[in-house]
Amino acid sequence: MKLEYPVYRDKVMGCWAGKNVGGVLGAPFECKRQFNGDVDFYTQDLSKGPVPNDDLDLQIVWLAAVERYGRTVNASILGEYWLSFVTPNWVEYGTGKSNLRAGLLPPLSGHVDNVYRNSCGCFIRSEIWACLAPGQPQLAAQYAREDAIVDHSEEGMYAEIFTAALQSAAFVESDPNTLIDIALSYVPADSALARAIAEARRCYQNQVDFREARKRVHNTAPGTFGLQEWTLDEIPVKDNEGMELGTPGFDAPENVAFSMLAWLYGEGDFGRSLCLANACGEDTDCTCATLGATLGIIMGAKNLPEKWLAPLDDKIATLCINRTSEGVWVPATVTELTDRVVRQAPLFVGQQLCEIYAPGGVVFECRSGRGLYCPQSARYLKGLNGHKKDIDLTPAEVAALTPYHVRYAYPAFSMDVDYRGSVTFTPGIERRITVTLVNSFTQYQQQWARVTLYTPPCAAVSSPRTVMLPLNNHVGAKAECTFAFTADETAPAKLELLVDVALEGRHSNGIAKVTLMAAEAEAGF
């Protein structure tokens, strides 16, 4: 399916304009568990332009990373931008940055000791990946995961993958239920996110009163975002009867589901849909902004109601970006942001998916129909010749990995370091890590890999320290080894190891640092 540049640009413009509208509408009601059903327009004084809102800020930082690193941008690069250019340290943001500084790489940084790993801070960053990969939800989901795992995991990560896939597909599909089905194919079917969205759809199909639907969605995956600023005895009773308190930090499933609920009940009306999202309470700037961006992509900027656009006057106000250095150029308007994004997209998707010399101008090649859904694993007989076969993990399979798998990609091979469920070690108790290598199926050569574990003097290795492993390129081929070591009582509180992989007869190599923290733990990791 072809997406011509003028249509694409209008949809990107609609995305950011809708994001801006929703964020401004919902901001005054954020962190409040209440039903805001009487709100039908902005409540702030906008005479001097929109108020700052963090829902758009971080994506401006990610755009700066893409402008420098292009399609090679990954979780590690985004982590560097977190440390340099993102100022807030609240909950998951601060924990993610703290873990990075301690030497824990993504996805460990987003998971370890992160009470808010399932919260809303990353699904609000999905639009940049959708706009850079229009009509390519598989690609958008891949980059959304790289973004999410820096400061989230599990349900928080699923939420960004879901919204990125949905918004990417929205460039070529407009039916809400079809788009929801597409996006759900990229996340685990048994996730709380999937259950909450299923409840939202069930309520709409059965025409449940919207107030009651809000309660049902909440109770399916109860979070606590609406309690952030209240003591327990300050929570309003009105409209909250029967609502469970929820689990702190478990906020993404219900808030994404609130956006879907409002979209369905809004039945195509931009303003009504956003006001319904706002009516649900909890993380209202996020739910409204995500829905506004989604509708903006579907409708395009030209079809968004002027009533909502005019008070904002195309302006962007930022809150969370470190502007004291030259690393990030902050756009002043939605138009400037749009121009910068559309300039990067052809390079981001590559020449196979974008023809810049097409008659009439730039044209994007988009997926359609079943091609928008997450692909299923190729079902080849193990051991077959892998030549010209796509046997990489699908986005859904990667999302299902535990956060203790740190993955690395190199030109001639990929590596997975499995921390085996923990980032801790205990002196005197054997500790293990598993290294898995997969050959590159673009280089088409069998090879041997030499894998070596380097440890400080305080750690004795009880397995072979160096192994030679064959890397074949048939279906299902992988090379795996487990290193076992024991730190003695002189070990520091932070133990740093190096896994070195070198290919025989090639200059390619890869080094992974493994960081472990001293703690009381059971043996057998």
Each language-model region and where it sits:
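Accessory "access/gating" subregions that flank catalytic or transport cores
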Residues: 100, 109-117, 131-136, 145-150, ...
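Short beta-strand elements of extracellular/lumenal beta-sandwich folds
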Residues: 427-443
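Low-complexity, acidic Ser/Thr/Pro/Gly-rich terminal tails and inter-domain linkers that flank the onset
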Residues: 358-426, 458, 462
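An N-terminal structural lobe/cap that precedes and organizes the functional/catalytic core
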Residues: 1-64, 77-78
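Short proline/glycine- and polar residue-rich coil/turn motifs
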Residues: 469-479
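Short, hydrophobic beta-strand segments
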Residues: 479-490
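Terminal connector regions
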Residues: 447, 452, 489-525
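Catalytic phosphate/nucleotide-handling subdomain of diverse soluble enzymes
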Residues: 21, 25, 32, 38-41, ...
